[in-house]
């Protein structure tokens, strides 16, 4: 029984890990022919923004409508300003 529980747990963890490595443009409201490198870069901005603001909703708001919202633009601005402050 313990082996079965361990196997189920391992499969579940691997499913989540594999799922995080692939980005689905439709999940972000982007066209299917979007540049995946650009999508990955913008996704990283949103992840950093979520970490910076410590808000659970930051990532969702940031990626809405294929990263075209004011929230995404503000995230970019906030991260740039935070980078400038650490340089000083």
Swiss-Prot record:
Entries under InterPro entries matching the protein: Crust_neurohorm, Crust_neurohorm_sf
SUPFAM superfamilies in alphabetical order: Crustacean CHH/MIH/GIH neurohormone
Primary location recorded for the protein, binned into one broad class: secreted
Pfam family, one: Crust_neurohorm
Signal peptide (residue range): 1-19
UniProt KW keywords: Disulfide bond, Secreted, Signal
GO cellular component: extracellular region
Compartments it resides in: Secreted
Tissue expression remark: Expressed by the venom gland.
Disulfide cross-links: 30-66, 46-62, 49-75
Misc remark: Co-purifies with latroinsectotoxin.
Role summary: May increase the toxicity of alpha-latrotoxin and/or other venom components. Is non-toxic to mice and to the cockroach Periplaneta americana.
Family affiliation: Belongs to the arthropod CHH/MIH/GIH/VIH hormone family.
Name of the protein described by the UniProt record: Alpha-latrotoxin associated low molecular weight protein 2
Organism, as annotated: Latrodectus geometricus (Brown widow spider)
Lineage of the organism: Eukaryota, Metazoa, Ecdysozoa, Arthropoda, Chelicerata
């Amino acid at each position: 029984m313990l082996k079965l529980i361990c196997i189920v747990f391992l499969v579940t963890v691997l499913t989540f890990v594999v799922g995080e490595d692939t980005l689905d443009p439709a999940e972000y409201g982007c066209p299917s022919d979007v540049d995946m490198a650009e999508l990955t870069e913008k996704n990283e901005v949103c992840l950093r923004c979520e970490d910076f603001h410590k808000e659970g909703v930051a990532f969702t708001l940031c990626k809405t409508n294929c990263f075209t919202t004011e929230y995404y633009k503000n995230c970019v601005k906030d991260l740039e300003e935070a980078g400038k402050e650490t340089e000083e």
